[in-house]
Amino acid sequence: MAPACLLAPLLLLLLGGFPLVPGESIRETEVIDPQDLLEGRYFSGALPDDEDAGGSDDFELSGSGDLDDTEEPRPFPEVIEPLVPLDNHIPENAQPGIRVPSEPKELEENEVIPKRAPSDVGDDMSNKVSMSSTAQGSNIFERTEVLAALIVGGVVGILFAVFLILLLVYRMKKKDEGSYDLGKKPIYKKAPTNEFYA
């Protein structure tokens, strides 16, 4: 009975709170024009409020049919073309004062070699933490949280089973004591029926 009472509010909370989540995520993904930010129109905390963007004509309609319901078609937002191209092309002569080395000797002099290459064998594994998002192929039972939960759940289950068996044995003994004990005197004794004749 208790799990059913707890299940109903949990389902209500999960199903009732679910529609609120997508609304917030849609609002967070609205696009802000980066050109407006670069031109300095808005400062920190002074960005336009999304709720104030709508016109007040939506609130003027009464819904009783008094006014004309036709709305003017709203134009689609214009696509802003970026001033800087979005490709990765870097011009060859980006800065006239810097010369790119082209000979093999110059390339070898400019090469940076790491002091110690990381190797997988023989390293100290004490500082390497296995993240759950990176351990894709690992077994679920290798994680300590899962093992601890399984052990605690098993202990609680075994204790519950032992107490249930003890309760059944106790009730059986109590029932057996009353039904087979013939040496006891009855609690109620029938009064003798003596008849007197006149």
Curated annotation (Swiss-Prot):
Residues 171-198 are cytoplasmic. GO terms for molecular function: fibronectin binding; identical protein binding; protein kinase C binding; thrombospondin receptor activity. It is found in: Membrane; Secreted. Shedding is enhanced by a number of factors such as heparanase, thrombin or EGF. Also by stress and wound healing. PMA-mediated shedding is inhibited by TIMP3. SMART domains: 4.1m. This is Syndecan-4. GO terms for cellular component: cell surface; costamere; extracellular region; focal adhesion; Golgi lumen; membrane. Glycans are attached at S44, S62, S64. Keywords: Glycoprotein, Heparan sulfate, Membrane, Proteoglycan, Secreted, Signal, Transmembrane, Transmembrane helix. It is a single-pass type I membrane protein. Ubiquitous. Highest levels in liver, kidney and lung. GO terms for biological process: inner ear receptor cell stereocilium organization; negative regulation of T cell proliferation; neural tube closure; positive regulation of exosomal secretion; positive regulation of extracellular exosome assembly; positive regulation of focal adhesion assembly; positive regulation of stress fiber assembly; regulation of fibroblast migration. InterPro entries: Neurexin-like, Syndecan, Syndecan/Neurexin_dom, Syndecan_CS. Residues 24-145 are extracellular. Cell surface proteoglycan which regulates exosome biogenesis in concert with SDCBP and PDCD6IP. The keyword tRNA processing does not apply. Belongs to the syndecan proteoglycan family. Residues 102-118 have a biased composition (Basic and acidic residues).
